Amino acid sequence: HVHMILVPSDADGLRAALGEAHRRYTKHVNDREGWRGYLWQGRFASCPMDETHLLAAARYVELNPVRARLAQQPQAWRWSSAAAHLDGRDDALCTVAPLLERVGGAGESWAAFLSETPGDEDAFDALRLGERTGRPVGADMCRNPFTATDRHP
């Protein structure tokens, strides 16, 4: 499975971008393998989140390959954004500035951020619940104009 932190440019942006990615990848694999039909179990899961949970989500996503024992260090996982954040350089899929600005920069600052775990398990549980339900995660979301009722099915 894949974890991504995405910020859509409009209310329909996430659905449109991921739908197109699913279609293209499915076509690529089906053409290569001579298959027909769907590759994905279902629609992607998503939830809006507040600033605190954004940082917890970043830590969760970048540490996931280590937790799953796919890599010994986050930056060693080929498909992780950890190397880009540690180097402080955008790559083809990741714009690093928005998260680096929140933790004090790249390199040692990002490495220290990844090693912190204050209340992470509670935040991770909240993120998992938000992912399953599609409901907003975090205290600030009550005031956020983008709520679960604004999303398209």
Tell where the protein language model's regions lie, with residue ranges:
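Basic, low-complexity intrinsically disordered segments
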Residues: 1
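Short Pro-Cys-Gly-centered "Cys-loop" motif that presents a nucleophilic cysteine in a tight turn
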Residues: 7-153
